[in-house]
């Protein structure tokens, strides 16, 4: 019994499979944003898909680039 847990693989994978989409406004065009794999749209809104495990890092990066997150929504897979 020592070292055993009651958590199964299903409970671990549920957080690993969660994906969220950030809607961001106010990103400045700079040498840092030029490194992105996407262009900043003319409307000013950018949609960034982020896995649950990286939400904090992505939030910090967006803030550092001068952006503001206006909406966060969870993306639901078609399998569910």
Curated annotation (Swiss-Prot):
The keyword Membrane applies. Keywords: Antenna complex, Membrane, Photosynthesis, Phycobilisome, Thylakoid. GO terms for biological process: photosynthesis. Associated with the phycobilisome, a hemidiscoidal structure that is composed of two distinct substructures: a core complex and a number of rods radiating from the core. Coiled coil: none annotated. One of its GO terms (cellular component) is plasma membrane-derived thylakoid membrane. The lineage of its organism: Bacteria, Bacillati, Cyanobacteriota, Cyanophyceae, Nostocales. This is Phycobilisome 8.9 kDa linker polypeptide, phycocyanin-associated, rod. Pfam families: CpcD. It is found in: Cellular thylakoid membrane. The gene is cpcD. SMART domains: CpcD. Residues 17-75 form the CpcD-like domain. The keyword Ribonucleoprotein does not apply.
């Amino acid at each position: 019994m020592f070292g055993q847990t009651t958590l199964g693989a299903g409970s671990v994978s549920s957080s690993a499979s969660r994906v969220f989409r950030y809607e961001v406004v106010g990103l400045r065009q700079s040498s840092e944003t030029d490194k992105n794999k996407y262009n900043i749209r003319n409307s000013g809104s950018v949609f960034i898909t982020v896995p649950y495990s990286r939400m904090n890092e992505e939030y910090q990066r967006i803030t550092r680039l001068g952006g503001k997150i206006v909406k966060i929504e969870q993306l639901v897979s078609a399998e569910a």
